[in-house]
UniProtKB/Swiss-Prot annotation:
The KH domain and the Qua2 region are involved in RNA binding. RNA reader protein, which recognizes and binds specific RNAs, thereby regulating RNA metabolic processes, such as pre-mRNA splicing, circular RNA (circRNA) formation, mRNA export, mRNA stability and/or translation. Involved in various cellular processes, such as mRNA storage into stress granules, apoptosis, lipid deposition, interferon response, glial cell fate and development. Binds to the 5'-NACUAAY-N(1,20)-UAAY-3' RNA core sequence. Acts as a mRNA modification reader that specifically recognizes and binds mRNA transcripts modified by internal N(7)-methylguanine (m7G). GO terms for cellular component: cytoplasm; cytosol; nucleus; synapse. Coiled coil: none annotated. It comes from Rattus norvegicus. Homodimer; does not require RNA to homodimerize. Able to heterodimerize with BICC1. The record marks N97, K120, R124, R130, K190, Q193 as: Involved in RNA binding. This is KH domain-containing RNA-binding protein QKI. A motif (SH3-binding) lies at residues 276-279. The modification Omega-N-methylarginine is found at R227, R242, R256. Residues 87-153 form the KH domain. GO terms for molecular function: DNA binding; internal N(7)-methylguanine-containing RNA reader activity; miRNA binding; mRNA 3'-UTR binding; mRNA binding; SH3 domain binding. Keywords: Cytoplasm, Developmental protein, Differentiation, DNA-binding, Methylation, mRNA processing, mRNA splicing, mRNA transport, Nucleus, Phosphoprotein, RNA-binding, SH3-binding, Translation regulation, Transport, Ubl conjugation. InterPro entries: BBP-like, KH_1_KHDC4/BBP-like, KH_dom, KH_dom_type_1_sf, Quaking_NLS, STAR_dimer.
Length: 341
């Protein structure tokens, strides 16, 4: 009908939903221009976070059972202050971290208990401070007398007598549940605290990620699938570290066998005695020095070659008499000498 508001059920208190709420709150607090503007939005977000944490806490401790009604009677009489101490069994369980279990990550568990019961919950006594040096320094000082006592939980409440007694009784029952150590691997409260810490640190993994059980099932399915039997892969020879000796002709055709080599003055070349003429004589070729053997191929042609030599036989440099030794020296030829020019 028109004018009727559609009521929707609250989302289930799941870790994913709590992570989304925490991210929204962190985003709002990181925007300075919006701080203090959306007062109702911030209040509704805080209330939803408290509701989700309360439902998750109740499901963890009470086994997903409906908690008894938290309704309180009307106040009768003046405001009184009540308190009670619950000592922690550290002597029976010396290795158990009761302080971390009661406070929770960043004190969230203790704050949740305070919001539910309406009482103030504090951890006092020896070992209640994280900094042991600071605890020893404060021991014996005013307002630090509790450090001389054993580790305990102090519960205080201020309300009318009839209401204060009910609140204190509920808080004592909830704290006593925390003072009972759970077996390793079966502590649901510890798992919830670790999950909240991961959400606060931003390291919580979404539930949509494939679980290990599913991964194992997929691996088993892959192993059960038929496989194609193939022969062993051939073993390849190791790669050669050096280039093998070429089987074809040499790379430098300009270097040929030396047949005759005569000096300009007519005397035989010194290498002629070492390398005798004949088709069986030749140069020693090293196949692993390619960059050094290719370079002289072009420089050989820069020098004049005697007519008596063959192509490839390097001759000494001949002095040409028709060239000037000095740039300012005048060359006098036979024709000029006869004419006197």
């Amino acid at each position: 009908m028109v004018g009727e508001m559609e009521t929707k059920e609250n989302p289930n208190p799941t870790p994913d939903y709590l992570m989304q709420l925490m991210n929204d709150k962190k985003l709002m607090s990181s925007l300075p221009n919006f701080c203090g503007i959306f007062n109702h939005l911030e209040r509704l977000l805080d209330e939803e976070i408290s509701r989700v944490r309360k439902d998750m806490y109740n499901d963890t401790l009470n086994g997903s059972t409906e908690k008894r009604s938290a309704e309180l009677p009307d106040a009768v009489g003046p405001i009184v202050q009540l308190q009670e101490k619950l000592y922690v069994p550290v002597k029976e369980y010396p290795d158990f971290n009761f302080v971390g279990r009661i406070l929770g990550p960043r004190g969230l568990t203790a704050k949740q208990l305070e919001a539910e019961t309406g009482c103030k919950i504090m951890v006092r006594g020896k070992g209640s401070m994280r900094d042991k040096k600071k605890e020893e320094q404060n021991r014996g000082k005013p307002n630090w007398e509790h450090l001389n006592e054993d580790l305990h939980v102090l519960i205080t409440v201020e309300d009318a007598q009839n209401r204060a007694e009910i609140k204190l009784k509920r808080a004592v029952e909830e704290v006593k549940k925390l003072l009972v150590p759970a077996a390793e691997g079966e502590d649901s409260l510890k798992k919830m605290q670790l999950m909240e810490l991961a959400i606060l640190n931003g390291t919580y993994r979404d539930a949509n990620i494939k679980s290990p059980a599913l991964a194992f099932s997929l691996a088993a399915t892959a192993q059960a699938a038929p496989r194609i039997i193939t022969g062993p892969a051939p073993v390849l020879p190791p790669a050669a570290l050096r280039t093998p000796t070429p089987a074809g002709p040499t790379i430098m055709p300009l270097i040929r066998q030396i047949q005759t080599a005569v000096m300009p003055n007519g005397t035989p070349h010194p290498t002629a005695a070492i390398v005798p003429p004949g088709p069986e004589a030749g140069l020693i070729y090293t196949p692993y020095e390619y960059p050094y053997t290719l370079a002289p191929a072009t420089s050989i042609l820069e020098y004049p070659i005697e007519p008596s030599g063959v192509l490839g036989a390097v001759a000494t440099k001949v002095r040409r008499h028709d060239m000037r030794v000095h740039p300012y020296q005048r060359i006098v030829t036979a024709d000029r000498a006869a004419t006197g020019n």
